[in-house]
Design a protein with these regions (language model features):
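Short, well-structured N-terminal submotif of metal-dependent ribonuclease cores
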Residues: 1-35, 50-57
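Histidine- and aromatic-rich ligand-binding microenvironments
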Residues: 5-6, 36, 89-90, 111, ...
Length: 123
């Protein structure tokens, strides 16, 4: 199985100080992984804004992760109106699940609130 990472999986997989890093790091090992520009941008925004990490370090760690894990990139090539979230809090997650489905992937997430058949909740 090939997986599209959501923003939280990417953050937890990269930042060693994150409480979820150990479980994310263990799950990610040996998996066939993909990301898309939306996820990359979300990682950068949260890492630099919420976590307060410096931009150069944030970008460097992302590049190291992508290279070491041999993560492939997929295009954000699904029109936004082709996903159909029911409320505003579902917009990005539902889009990523639909994007994963379009590319024959599963969306890997720790978020149990995403209701979509292309989602694999990691525990």
């Amino acid at each position: 199985m090939k997986y599209l990472l959501d923003v939280n999986m990417l953050i937890q997989g990269i930042w060693q100080g994150h409480p979820g890093h150990v479980s994310a790091f263990a799950w990610l090992k040996g998996k066939n992984l993909s990301i898309c520009p939306l996820v990359e941008l979300g990682y950068i925004r949260i890492s630099t804004g919420v976590l307060g990490a410096p931009m150069p370090e944030t970008r460097r760690l992302l590049q190291v992760f992508l290279t070491e894990r041999k993560v492939s990139r997929i295009d954000d090539d699904l029109p936004a109106l082709e996903s159909s979230p029911q409320k505003s809090s579902e917009v990005t997650d539902h889009y990523l699940a639909c994007l994963a489905q379009k590319h024959g992937l599963k969306l890997a997430t720790f978020d149990t609130r995403i209701s979509h058949h292309a989602v694999e909740v990691i525990s």
